[in-house]
């Protein structure tokens, strides 16, 4: 049995969980998330917690057990607290701003790059260089942050580009020059 999967998921007071077969719907103060879990697991609500269990002893069921428990736990945390990821833009003339809901990034190209958020994702910008991606779905927040970082990944010589907050860039030495 999975060590992660066997732990029950506590349900906070303001969160409502609806189970119908393998479809899980979680409603909370931050929004609503729906997900259909793969076959091989069963999801049950016991008191104020959710228990995920494998339906058989097959390897595929046991593999999905911990995954499904973590997916449901991330849904519960997402609708109650939400998720956010911070990015930093490093470099002269590189900046970001929000126009409406769209994020406009000037990252050294001849044109500004526009990023349109999917439903449930919001962008906020502080000091023109710090971007925060926030939402209820952990996977979607991470994917959008990765898309923004991919516009101009940090380069190893001067560290210019878009990086996650707290990310360490492995720096390289420049050319040593002819002697």
UniProtKB/Swiss-Prot annotation:
Primary role: This protein binds to the 23S rRNA, and is important in its secondary structure. It is located near the subunit interface in the base of the L7/L12 stalk, and near the tRNA binding site of the peptidyltransferase center.
Organism of derivation: Synechococcus sp. (strain CC9311)
GO terms, molecular function: rRNA binding; structural constituent of ribosome
Top-level taxon in the UniProt lineage: Bacteria
One GO process term, biological-process aspect: cytoplasmic translation
Keywords noted in UniProt: Ribonucleoprotein, Ribosomal protein, RNA-binding, rRNA-binding
GO CC entries: cytosolic large ribosomal subunit
HAMAP family: Ribosomal_uL6_B (MF_01365_B)
Protein name from the UniProt record: Large ribosomal subunit protein uL6
